[in-house]
Amino acid sequence: MGTDAGANIALHVGLRAAECGDNLKPLQIKGLILHQPFFGGVERTPAEMRLANNKILPIEATDLMWELSLPAGADRNHEYCNPMKGKVAQSLGLIKEKGWNVTTTSCGGDPLIDRQKEVEKALEEKGVTLVSKYVDGECHGYDLLEPSKAELLMCALKDTVHISR
């Protein structure tokens, strides 16, 4: 499980664990929870353009965060940022092979939502059992700003645990 950039890390660690086959036993992974993942890319999406001046997550801030965190010389189409590029996109089928479920959360006021939905679509195309939780109008990280609004995350956790049993 991961929130924001932690969701990106959870996806990458999950895929690496899936590649390990049975070498991680007795550890049993049942699924991944990607809470408002921090995906990006070089080409601007409609949501990024529409919400470029978002008060919580303006596009200049996301660009700067990626510039500071990606490997030297990499752009925002690096697989750490854009999971639809590189090895990650081809590896999503491993999640299905392992029988894992994936739960995602997103919100309509998030400039990153188009990329989140793109990854959800790719997972569904690979046959992965996906539970997608969506809140209209809220911004990226809204539940951190107002913890009383963390219900979406709690529902996602509950549903993922319930499905994975």
PLM segments and residue spans:
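Alpha/beta-hydrolase superfamily serine-hydrolase fold, recognizing
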Residues: 1-165
